[in-house]
Amino acid sequence: FLGTGCNSLNETVDLIKYGYEYGFKDFLIMPPAYYKGNTDKGVFNFYSYIISKIPKIKIVIYNFEHLSGYKFSVEAVTKLVTTFPNNIIGCKDSTANLFENLKLPNFLIFPGTETKLLKGLEIGNSGIISAVCNVTAPLARKVFDDFEKKKEQTQNDKLIAVRQAFDGYN
């Protein structure tokens, strides 16, 4: 996924178009963070506008209330997916209010932290998307592979400990 998001809707669209021209099809897009008090309707209109300008893209919405000031609800995500089933394909959930509660067929869910990887996999999530995976990738991969192979989890506690060490700096 190519992460896009600027302080201007038009710049966001331009960045997505540029990425699309260079072969990217899947984009991680956070709702606008430059307006306070975003509503479900406003966020719906934001994604609708992007899709109207680049209709062939696939979007993983980015739920990160701390950064964007908006927290997706199950209802808001469901409306986006129902309206744009060929475009809205998943959610990165850094707010952690959706990964356990959102149940949509053929919808990718990625918690935004290693601390939720194993639990997420156990309830049907697809994996994680985490900046800290730049450091924890071998451990996260081991947890993922062991889960897929139904092997005993030997690295999850270590993975969580490394992540929590980073969380201490937030």
Can you describe what each PLM-predicted range is?
Residues 49-57, 64-167:
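Catalytic alpha/beta core domains of metabolic enzymes, predominantly
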Residues 1-69, 77:
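Active-site beta->alpha loop and helix N-cap motifs at the rims of alpha/beta catalytic domains
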